[in-house]
Structure formats: structure tokens, C-alpha cells
UniProtKB/Swiss-Prot annotation:
Gene Ontology MF annotations: structural constituent of ribosome
InterPro entries reported for this sequence: NA-bd_OB-fold, Ribosomal_eS28, Ribosomal_eS28_CS
PROSITE patterns recorded: RIBOSOMAL_S28E (PS00961)
Superkingdom, natural source: Archaea
Pfam family, one: Ribosomal_S28e
Protein name: Small ribosomal subunit protein eS28
Gene Ontology annotations for the cellular component aspect, listed alphabetically: cytosolic small ribosomal subunit
BP term (GO), one: translation
Gene name, Swiss-Prot/TrEMBL: rps28e
Keywords: Ribonucleoprotein, Ribosomal protein
UniProt family annotation: Belongs to the eukaryotic ribosomal protein eS28 family.
């Protein structure tokens, strides 16, 4: 399952999002794969800091603000 994952390093923490602030929006730099070097925004659950390496299942999607539907 983790064979499909792509590593990405957190370069900036943009802020909290979601109805109660449960997710953190971060900018990550993709470290390998077809999108290597690309910086994208993603929503992350749980504690995260600059320099952390996240394993992304897909690198094509950009995060949007989470809000009430």
C-alpha cells in the first residue's frame, strides 16, 4: 500500500482550516516522482511542523479551504 506513496517535505504552515480547526493547511515540496520539485498545498490532520516528510497517495490535487457545507 505504501509503495504508491510519494514523499513530500513540509515547507510552510499556512494555517488551520475546517469547522473546528481540526486540519492544518501546509505547503509541501514533492521529493520524488513525476511531480518532483513541485510545491502544492495540502490539508493535514494531526501534529505537523516544517521539515516533516509526508507520504502522499497522490500529488495532483491541491487543497482548498474546508468549510461548513
Amino acid at each position: 500500500m505504501e509503495d504508491d506513496a510519494t514523499p513530500a517535505e513540509v515547507v510552510e504552515i499556512m494555517g488551520r482550516t475546517g469547522m473546528t480547526g481540526e486540519a492544518t493547511t501546509v505547503k509541501v515540496r514533492v521529493l520524488s516522482g513525476k511531480d518532483q520539485g513541485r510545491i502544492i498545498a495540502r490539508n493535514v490532520l494531526g501534529p505537523v511542523k516544517v521539515g516533516d516528510v509526508l507520504m502522499l497517495r497522490e500529488t495532483a490535487r491541491e487543497a482548498r479551504k474546508l468549510s461548513i457545507r
